[in-house]
């Protein structure tokens, strides 16, 4: 290993695609990005967290039990992160678990009588991704690049960073998903300036970004999207069709049956995926419910054309953001040389047709839409550590940022699609004589009036010296960092009085709450580790007892009675220990049995030695000698099994 390779091993930064439906983790290895498979052997992990009593399940185990535990299984939590309860009323209607609001009006989950925030759910998924990387790399991971939808606002980005902190990760950079995909696509492209569009339709959000790439520079020209549009909405369209059809045929409304709804939601997702490759699919859900006449079964045929009619409006909703992104970039469709398809929904033929109609060309299918974002995040991690050189990423802010001014008007300071990091300053004044303070209300959005945009923060600049209206010179500065997170300051130029804030997420997570959640996550990680160790000890003890009993039954005629009785007692001790929750007792009983089992091995070795001595009498010597001679002259015979055994044993000798 060279010095440079050794250095790249230190401070490795993983790339995480924290998706609505699935998440993925990748890392730079040997100068190339590598997607890491989970413990279950899959390259993506369902973004699902479930609670069963004191147990927390993440990923595939959580998804598997969702049908029987829908109220305590959180899916699509990304649609709620950094958002107020009033902003997610439409999403709440589509999930089986309880979404409520806390004291700040934030959307939170109520699980088993406790309040759990979307940030905590996201943190559990990030911990799973972190552990997946650690298991593969064999080293502790503390740093990550995490992707977010390009159209995520400031609150949602900050909440994602908070989730990373709760998971024990230092989030070195938040980057938009389309930008990450462009990095993955363009890293090995040697072509000079090339303009591309990244069409990213995932499980919960839609993004479109237009970029110019060339000579290692990835410059985002514009971005647009819809954070309320994704695969979940397509699933719900199929689900509603199934519910209506079943109600018409059977006269039974399944909407209040949460277990049936979860089964149908899973069936809808499966049918949607299948119809990307076939023209029709069967949906069969036996014993979905029952009435006085007996059990009812749901059997339906869904064709691709029917799916397209059910989801036509959803697919068409991708058109306007694409046209807006093109317009904002100053390009037309003929200037775009490639349209990169990202996100699972981009596999749908009807979606690909819309892409073709908008851009006048087929979408590029040379990247894996489920993995490309994580790959791009890993590349960005490589850029930050110096593993990837000569790459410059120039991103933009997706929404206009400004403040409220006289008359309830929003005055922009940073226009949308401004390259970041950036700083903008503007001078304002007071609206009344002798005004002692001003309230700076920070807004994000494209509307003209302040109340029509999203308020992402507010603060006061006090102790302004008395003076006529319009006289004080108040400088407001907006500073956006590379993560797209905003820092705001206001300064009275006459007195030098200044007030600064970093715009915190409107998730209501204060510093103390984040620290508490970090501690909670660490404690749960320790609990999970102990629980895993307990399961392993139990399995080992149970397996040993079984093997010991089998060996005892097999060799009971050759084992002295005293040893046989001792082993029987030890087996019984293990079985009794397994009936308890005392792990120390189980471990002790297992160790005792292991020691006792060695005696069987010793007895059998002696018996084998005596048997071999007896078998080498005058009558058998010639045969043995012949075999030995035969071995020497036929080294390479494939059926010479005895010789193979001897060679293996010899190889193991020091």
Curated annotation (Swiss-Prot):
Pfam families: HSP70 (PF00012). It comes from Protochlamydia amoebophila (strain UWE25). InterPro entries: ATPase_NBD (IPR043129), Chaperone_DnaK (IPR012725), Heat_shock_70_CS (IPR018181), HSP70_C_sf (IPR029048), HSP70_peptide-bd_sf (IPR029047), Hsp_70_fam (IPR013126). Residues 622-636 have a biased composition (Low complexity). PROSITE patterns: HSP70_1 (PS00297), HSP70_2 (PS00329), HSP70_3 (PS01036). Belongs to the heat shock protein 70 family. Residues 608-621 have a biased composition (Polar residues). This is Chaperone protein DnaK. Induction: By stress conditions e.g. heat shock. The keyword ATP-binding applies. The gene is dnaK. Gene3D superfamilies: 1.20.1270.10, 3.30.420.40, Actin, Chain A, domain 4, Substrate Binding Domain Of DNAk, Chain A, domain 1. Residues 592-654 are annotated as: Disordered.
